[in-house]
């Protein structure tokens, strides 16, 4: 490129660049220390000797020490703060826990006493509130008011019967009779129950002959509820139970009529039914067992009032019903015969029907009902104030067996089976998707169908229910029992073990469309090895529904976490379910944290998950009855010759270290030798054996049980010993003519140890 082609601007720019280069070379190579200031930064220049001197200073030990000291001073506070935080995180939880432990040990007695006072006050307030809610005092006043003003209140009944009177009568004089009957029905207990039992239940008996032996067919083979087995509609009809057309129509017509009348009933009068309490059936010479059950509940801490149900006036004992129960055990006697009238009582004479009548005529609304041979091992009172009772107002417990109810019953009751919704008939590892494709008549478990009750059978040794809420179902269940021998026992059981009321409750609840809780829980079987080598079942252990409610919530959460069907049966037999339960225990073996305060780190502990614990021990054969048991005390293989619930090494873990067999018999000794010691009438009329003989027999058996007991506290009574002075048992005179009045065998005996 020639210079002529460069523009003046290019020449000027080149000159400036050349000048800057020359200037920089001059400055950087200068041998004098100068400071050159130009527009922009300030440049410091020096010769090489001074630069080397500064470098030497930086390398010196003195400089390094000085610099280190400066850094330490600057960072000292920061380092101390960091160390303090680390130590606090590492050591504080342990220090706090140590202080907690020291304080707990130092003040534990004071804390316990303070808590005891608070709990006592709180519980007293709760009991007061419960009675306030039950309107017990109010109901008594209403009852008194109604009786006092009976004549004045007759017009109130007029409106209820005018329409009926208009249809049934043509003359005015009959109206007074109608008013009198209506008034009696609403204001006299006996007339009220007579109306329900006679006018509705007895008057609607099927108008046909009972089923013949041929029509009843054959008995089916019972199945344990933990075994997965298809019991199909085809199998159930295979019993060959048949009902000819005319007889079937009569059964259905009577059933329709009684259901219609029951559904139209108003709520029961509050002066007849109110409050919370416990009802124990002691009829049929079961007073010894019943008093043991009641005394045991008091020893467990129960404070609810108790009603002891007796069948007849002949079972009434003045000392028991007027002194022992009201003055020491907060209870009273209720005689069924007096409540319903002799006419109705004599007609309804089957024992399980009378058991239901006893529940009906008791005065409580919210009831914990127990057989005389059923003993609680915990306080039962708050069953009425917790789930699942609050949601359903009816708690039922499972028996050992599955239902074998005939499909013909559901046709009589007009209950139509729906689609497959449950899976009791198949193993837990089977596919439900495949199950629902099976033939419903021959390949599907019948009670897995919608609209039908669960396949789980019911054990009615204990029930918890609201009578006001479930009166209609209880009356229908009584109707089934009244007509059981002729029709319904064969329709509902078809060979299933057990008898009586247990399989009549749930069908009645379904017909009336009333809510209830019946959950599949493990039923524990206790017994002994008989001399012939066979295992003899004596006792059923029923679990606490308060635990079961939470257990099933946990179980379903576990199944959901594994993406499994939440209907799987946790108590089904088989290896798959056993492995699944082990996984469930691992799933629940989690860390629980103490409550944290401020910045306190959590202290952890490991908790092993526990399945629902036992609440009731239903000792159905032999019963804990000091009178009956003492009659065979000298027999070689009698009740008092062995442990009936099992050897200590087999039951200690299940019963959580408490020897309940020894505890129960200790209480039965208190009943026989102290509680009814003043009742010469009882010993003469009912016992058939002297009190001294009974006490000696029970005492010897207690000493026998103490030899291998694992429970040193078993014979110590706390609450019962505070109820009054102990009296020495006296041998009353025995009327030999009455010695055989109570020599019948156990009426509550069941096949294979199934409870009634």
Curated annotation (Swiss-Prot):
Membrane-spanning segments: 11-31
Positions of the UniProt region annotated as Disordered: 723-756
Ribosomal protein in keyword set: no
Biased composition (Polar residues): 723-734
UniProt entry keywords in alphabetical sequence: Golgi apparatus, Membrane, Signal-anchor, Transferase, Transmembrane, Transmembrane helix
Enzyme Commission number, as recorded: 2.4.1.-
Pathway(s) where this gene product acts: Protein modification; protein glycosylation
Membrane topology recorded in Swiss-Prot or TrEMBL: Single-pass type II membrane protein
Claim: Transferase is one of the keywords in the record: yes
Source organism, top-level taxon: Eukaryota
Compartment(s): Golgi apparatus membrane
Any single Pfam family the record assigns to this protein: Mannosyl_trans3
InterPro entries in the cross-refs: Alpha_mannosyltransferase, Nucleotide-diphossugar_trans
Positions on the Extracellular side per record topology: 32-756
Gene Ontology MF terms: alpha-1,2-mannosyltransferase activity
Primary localisation category: Golgi
Family, as annotated: Belongs to the MNN1/MNT family.
Protein name: Alpha-1,2-mannosyltransferase MNN26
Organism per entry: Candida albicans (strain SC5314 / ATCC MYA-2876) (Yeast)
Lineage, uppermost ranks: Eukaryota, Fungi, Dikarya, Ascomycota, Saccharomycotina
């Amino acid at each position: 490129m020639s210079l002529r082609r460069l523009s003046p601007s290019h020449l000027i720019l080149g000159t400036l660049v050349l000048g800057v280069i020359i200037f920089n070379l001059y400055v950087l190579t200068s041998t004098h220390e100068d400071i050159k200031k130009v527009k922009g930064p300030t440049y410091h220049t020096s010769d090489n000797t001074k630069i080397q001197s500064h470098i030497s200073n930086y390398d010196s030990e003195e400089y390094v020490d000085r610099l280190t000291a400066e850094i330490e001073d600057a960072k000292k506070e920061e380092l101390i703060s960091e160390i303090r935080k680390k130590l606090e995180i590492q050591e504080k939880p342990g220090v706090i826990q140590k202080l907690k432990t020291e304080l707990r040990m130092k003040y534990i007695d004071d804390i316990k006493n303070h808590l005891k006072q608070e709990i006592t006050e709180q519980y007293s307030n709760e009991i007061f509130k419960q009675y306030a809610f039950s309107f017990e005092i109010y109901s008594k006043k209403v009852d008194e008011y109604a009786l006092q003003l009976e004549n004045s209140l007759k017009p109130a009944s007029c409106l209820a019967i005018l329409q009926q009177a208009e249809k049934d009568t043509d003359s005015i004089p009959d109206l007074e009779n109608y008013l009198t009957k209506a008034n009696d029905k609403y204001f006299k207990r006996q007339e009220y129950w007579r109306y329900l039992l006679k006018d509705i239940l007895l008057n609607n008996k099927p108008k046909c002959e009972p089923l013949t032996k041929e029509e009843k067919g054959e008995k089916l083979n019972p199945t344990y509820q933990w075994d997965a087995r298809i019991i199909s509609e085809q199998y159930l009809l295979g019993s060959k139970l048949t009902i000819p057309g005319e007889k079937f129509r009569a059964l259905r017509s009577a059933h329709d009529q009684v259901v219609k009348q029951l559904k139209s009933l108003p709520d029961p009068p509050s002066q007849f039914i109110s409050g919370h309490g416990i009802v124990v059936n002691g009829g049929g010479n079961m007073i010894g067992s019943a008093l043991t059950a009641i005394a045991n509940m008091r020893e467990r801490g129960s404070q609810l009032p108790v009603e002891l149900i007796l069948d007849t006036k002949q079972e009434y004992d003045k000392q028991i019903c007027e002194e022992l129960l009201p003055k020491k055990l907060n209870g009273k006697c209720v005689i069924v015969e007096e409540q319903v009238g002799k006419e109705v009582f004599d007609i309804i004479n089957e024992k399980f029907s009378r058991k239901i009548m006893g529940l009906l005529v008791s005065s409580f609304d919210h009831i914990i009902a127990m057989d005389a041979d059923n003993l609680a091992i915990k306080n039962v009172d708050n069953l009425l104030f917790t789930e699942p009772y609050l949601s359903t107002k009816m708690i039922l417990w499972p028996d050992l067996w599955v239902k074998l109810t005939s499909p013909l019953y559901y046709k009589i009751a007009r209950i139509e089976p729906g689609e497959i919704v449950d899976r009791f008939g198949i193993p837990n590892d089977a596919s439900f998707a495949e199950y629902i494709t099976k033939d419903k008549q021959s390949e599907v478990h019948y009670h897995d169908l919608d609209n039908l009750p669960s396949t789980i059978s019911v054990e009615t040794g204990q029930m918890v229910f609201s009578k006001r809420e479930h009166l209609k179902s209880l009356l229908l269940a009584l109707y089934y029992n009244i007509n059981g021998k002729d029709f319904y026992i064969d329709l509902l059981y078809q060979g299933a073990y057990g008898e009586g009321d247990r399989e009549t409750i749930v069908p009645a609840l379904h017909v009336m469309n009333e809510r209830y809780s019946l959950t599949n829980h493990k039923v524990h079987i206790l017994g002994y090895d008989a001399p012939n080598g066979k295992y003899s079942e004596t006792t059923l252990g029923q679990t606490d529904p308060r635990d079961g409610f939470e257990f099933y919530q946990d179980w379903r959460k576990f199944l959901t976490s594994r993406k499994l069907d939440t209907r799987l049966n946790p108590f089904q037999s088989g290896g798959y379910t056993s492995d699944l339960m082990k996984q469930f225990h691992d799933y629940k073996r989690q860390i629980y944290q103490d409550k944290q305060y401020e910045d306190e780190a959590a202290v952890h502990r490991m908790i092993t998950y526990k399945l629902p614990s036992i609440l009731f021990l239903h000792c159905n054969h032999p019963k804990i009855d000091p009178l009956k048991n003492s009659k065979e005390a000298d027999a070689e293989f009698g009740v008092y010759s062995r442990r009936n619930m099992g050897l200590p090494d087999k039951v200690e873990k299940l019963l959580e270290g408490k020897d309940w067999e020894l505890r129960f018999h200790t209480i039965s000794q208190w009943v026989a030798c102290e509680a009814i010691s003043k009742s010469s009438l009882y010993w003469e009329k009912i016992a058939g054996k002297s009190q001294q003989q009974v006490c000696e027999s029970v005492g010897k058996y207690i000493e026998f049980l103490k030899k291998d007991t694992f429970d040193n506290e078993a014979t110590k009574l706390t609450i019962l010993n505070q109820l009054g002075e102990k009296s020495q048992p006296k041998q009353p005179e025995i009327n030999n003519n009455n010695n055989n009045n109570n020599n019948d065998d156990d009426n509550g005996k069941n096949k294979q140890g199934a409870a009634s």
